[in-house]
Amino acid sequence: MPRKGPVSKRSVLPDPKFGSHLMTKFINRLMHDGKKGVAENLFYQAVEVLAEKSGEDPLKAFEKAIGNVKPHMEVKPRRVGGATYQVPMEVRPERQVTLALRWLINQARARGEKGMADKLSGELLDAYHNRGGAVKKKEDTHRMADANKAFAHYRW
């Protein structure tokens, strides 16, 4: 906790090609070693493939893919009398986006295709069609929250 009051949120500039803040956040998460140009090229290639295969506007297709991965519930550990319970909690909208971006990128990196652009486009296309590793991660998170509904009264 900061001693000098709440920390202000830093805003990100919209990306130059589509004018989307969400795309900029994705590119920043994708970036390695400060190489933003490389990350942008990979991302734009992947989004073009996604738009081509989905037959929809690139921005809308990307937003739909992110929307399909956003979790609504998650579990957080809560210690009560020596026992730790997994308490289901609603996920704040900002955290939903953060988790969705993280899961998509991690699952894309874990895929077997050759080249990051192909991996990313494959994962985005799977997310667009409500399947794939990132959507499975979301469903697992929801399943955990559902299984621990009995501890919902420990919410704080």
UniProtKB/Swiss-Prot annotation:
Superkingdom of source: Bacteria
Cellular component GO terms, alphabetically?
small ribosomal subunit
Matching Pfam families = Ribosomal_S7
Q: Name one GO biological process term.
A: translation
Has keyword Nucleus? Answer: no
Instruction: Fetch the InterPro entries from UniProt.
Output: Ribosomal_uS7, Ribosomal_uS7_bac/org-type, Ribosomal_uS7_CS, Ribosomal_uS7_dom, Ribosomal_uS7_dom_sf
SUPFAM superfamilies xrefs: Ribosomal protein S7 (SSF47973)
Write out the GO MF terms. Answer: rRNA binding; structural constituent of ribosome; tRNA binding
- What binding partners and quaternary form does the record give? Part of the 30S ribosomal subunit. Contacts proteins S9 and S11.
Family assignment from sequence similarity: Belongs to the universal ribosomal protein uS7 family.
Function, as annotated: One of the primary rRNA binding proteins, it binds directly to 16S rRNA where it nucleates assembly of the head domain of the 30S subunit. Is located at the subunit interface close to the decoding center, probably blocks exit of the E-site tRNA.
Put simply, this protein is called Small ribosomal subunit protein uS7
The species is Solidesulfovibrio magneticus (strain ATCC 700980 / DSM 13731 / RS-1) (Desulfovibrio magneticus)
The gene is rpsG
